[in-house]
Amino acid sequence: MNQLDGIKQFTTVVADSGDIESIRHYQPQDATTNPSLLLKAAGLEQYGHLIEDAIAWGKKHGGTQEQQVAAASDKLAVNFGAEILKSIPGRVSTEVDARLSFDKEKSIEKARHLVGLYQQQGIDKSRILIKLAATWEGIRAAGQLEKEGINCNLTLLFSFAQARACAEAGVYLISPFVGRIYDWYQARSPLEPYVVEEDPGVKSVRNIYDYFKQHRYETIVMGASFRRTEQILALTGCDRLTISPNLLKELKEKEEPVIRKLVPSSQMFHRPTSMTEAEFRWEHNQDAMAVEKLSEGIRLFAVDQRKLEDLLAAKL
């Protein structure tokens, strides 16, 4: 049995890609997209029809060019998501514009709009996850959306405070980042020789997983942002793992046994009182890595969102 199939015995595998052909090839349960992945996929010739449809939608929407571009951009994200859903049995994650990361109300409005666009294509909200950055405002927005039956995936999650706040808000799923945490520490104090058990990104996800299971939080933990297969194998047993096509390929080509590493704890603890906004901001602020990586992640997604909009504007 190859390692990918071995992991699938213990963990739901999700494809971290906007490339529909790759998704079909690796047969994941779910798929995640973001502006960076959509920008990459939009440059591929085989997806030209999805872009043309989004452009036509933007023109039909009317208004200023800026409004038409915004309409086309939302439609493009949904077009990719709808196409991906034809190839997977589960859900696709579609991201809210990163520039709304500090605006609770506009994030809620955008999420409802994206769900509405999916519903116009006959796709039920039960097959969609709305991705939001795990800022305090994003977490509050997600808490409200969950009450409306719109499930959310909280991304750019680097600190334990972010994870705990998401669980306390009743968020459906979180995406703690492994690789970007590893990158930050590796740039400052390289882990040489590399020992996966000491990888700070792996340790972060393990701690979150254990805490959620011990306190009976139902929020799904989906490890994300991997740099090497060792990180993935060390988190086998995590609820879900979202993996890029190049690492899915590596795992599929290796015929080695896979051992479950994460197992729900039999120890149970009472849940603490929910964090206040001030407590969340203080705890998150204590983690220099998390503060830096969350800010950087939002900026990078915003840059790629603008590039995507420039690409669409040139065609309008």
Curated annotation (Swiss-Prot):
SUPFAM superfamilies: Aldolase (SSF51569). The keyword Kinase does not apply. Keywords: Cytoplasm, Pentose shunt, Schiff base, Transferase. It catalyses: D-sedoheptulose 7-phosphate + D-glyceraldehyde 3-phosphate = D-erythrose 4-phosphate + beta-D-fructose 6-phosphate. It is an enzyme of class 2 (transferase). Disulfide bonds: none annotated. One of its GO terms (biological process) is pentose-phosphate shunt. One of its GO terms (cellular component) is cytosol. The keyword Ubl conjugation does not apply. It is found in: Cytoplasm. Its EC number is 2.2.1.2. Belongs to the transaldolase family. Type 1 subfamily. PANTHER family: TRANSALDOLASE, TRANSALDOLASE A. Transaldolase is important for the balance of metabolites in the pentose-phosphate pathway. Homodimer. This is Transaldolase 2. The lineage of its organism: Bacteria, Pseudomonadati, Pseudomonadota, Gammaproteobacteria, Enterobacterales. The gene is tal2.
